[in-house]
Amino acid sequence: LNLAFNRQERTAESIIISGKERQINIENAPALSIDVEQNIPVLSKADNKKWGVIFGIENYRNVSSVPFARRDAEFMKEYFNKVLGIPTENIYFQTDESATLSEFKTVFDPGGWLAKNAGKPGNEIYIYYSGHGAPDPAGNKAYLLPADGNPNYAAISGYGLDQLYANLAQLKVKQITLFLDSCFSGANRDNETILASARPVFITTTIPSVASNIAVFSAATGNQISSGYSDKQHGLFSYYLMKGLRGEADSNKDNKLTQKELNDYLSEQVNTQARRMGREQEPQLQSAEPERVILQW
């Protein structure tokens, strides 16, 4: 053996392994992607004969919030413009604290913004509302609840559906289509009562009839609640409304979407998902002409 005196020999344990230093890149995880918010298709050209009104109220002064209602409204504005072909300047848009009872009256009352601007023969009007609905227990009437409204005094601080439908019926226009992501049971999207009485059984209201040129898509039936869809960050009804409008509700693939097709799609999808969440929610359509085409592309 060639071992020198006082010389330290290398052993297996003392062998140093060298290598190049490598930089590890850690990329940020992508943000949550909501399909209905991505690549919204342009299905209609801008048409000056089309008008829109959008109210989305998430935060209220006197009652619990409506999760995702403002987000619903913001993206429905894009759908109104790109999918339905409503020019941006023809859309009346208010959210949260700006959507007061005064604003509802300004838009919907006789002689208001809608009547002065859109109330002409040949025009089409689209209305979207996401927020609380409230019942009047005394008269079983249904009200849309503005941001400054109080559900315990819906008759004086809300905007009645019967009043809304009557005012719209006076407009001599071609067609009016409403999308109401609200319920009138006295409960919020978390199935909690919004009334001071805290009744264990929610209230069934009487929904007024509509004129022959008015179609109303409602999120729920009777005393059901209009649910939120946390995974998609939208109201359950609004989420599937957007999916349906972008073409998924076109059941026969003829590039035309009728009221009936949209309602059938909403009924199936919303009801199925609501049951997965342990709830019942059945959208409904009020229309004298369900085969009427909403859009074609």
Set out the residue ranges of the language-model regions.
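Caspase-like cysteine protease fold
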Residues: 3-4, 9-21, 32-34, 38-45, ...
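Functional beta-strand-loop-alpha-helix junction segments that form "active/interaction loops"
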Residues: 11, 16-39, 73, 77-123, ...
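Short glycine-rich His-centered loop
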Residues: 48-64
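Caspase-like (clan CD) cysteine peptidase catalytic core
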Residues: 49, 102-130, 134-193, 263
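Short, conserved active-site loop motifs that form the nucleotide-linked donor/cofactor pocket
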Residues: 50, 91, 214
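Active-site-proximal C-terminal subdomain of hydrolase catalytic domains
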Residues: 56, 80, 95, 173-280
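Glycine- and acidic-residue-enriched helix-capping/strand-helix junction motifs
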Residues: 60-74, 78, 154, 228-232
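Stable alpha-helical elements in mature extracytoplasmic
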Residues: 69-76, 100-107, 160, 164, ...
